Regions:
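N-terminal assembly/interaction segments in proteins that build large macromolecular machines
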Residues: 1-154
Length: 154
């Protein structure tokens, strides 16, 4: 069990709200939580929060984690994929596995924690966050975010 996994069930209620504005056209506000206000004041924690805000500005995720994807959205996309003509000739159980893989790929770009980390694409945002948990010795949770782009409505 890694350090990050051991700390994963600990309560993270402190932290900070980080904001980032890119070229006056894209704005991001993100809530990043940790266990103590001491860690929230550390430069490493502040840097993590800032880098996550930059990630959100650059990559436009819709959800923090897979758990945040609404069931209706998941079912809608799954139904579209299942209706694909290229899957019609495949056996049922093979179609299920193919669709599961396609679903994972479809949502990987929309889920912040699954995205390739922009400053080191050899790891995901989730892996980068786990490294910070191990380094800082506390559970860290990216709770929520809002991304606003000039001239673009939701």
């Amino acid at each position: 069990m890694t350090k990050a996994e051991k700390k994963g069930d600990r309560e993270a209620r402190e932290g900070l709200i980080e904001s980032y504005v890119h070229s006056g056209r894209i704005g991001v506000i993100v809530e990043v939580n940790c266990e103590t206000d001491f860690v929230a004041r550390l430069d490493d924690f502040k840097t993590l929060a800032h880098e996550v805000a930059m990630q959100i500005a650059a990559m436009s995720p819709k959800y923090v984690s897979e758990a945040d994807i609404p069931a209706e959205e998941m079912e809608r996309v799954k139904a579209e994929l299942m209706a694909s003509e290229s899957l019609a000739s495949k056996p049922e159980e093979m179609r299920e596995k193919i669709v599961e893989g396609q679903l994972k790929k479809h949502f990987a770009e929309q889920v912040l924690m699954s995205q390739a980390y922009i400053l080191d694409d050899s790891k995901t945002v989730e892996q980068h966050t786990k490294e910070a948990i191990a380094k800082l010795g506390e559970n860290i949770v990216i709770r929520q975010f809002k991304r606003i782009e000039l001239g673009v409505s939701e």
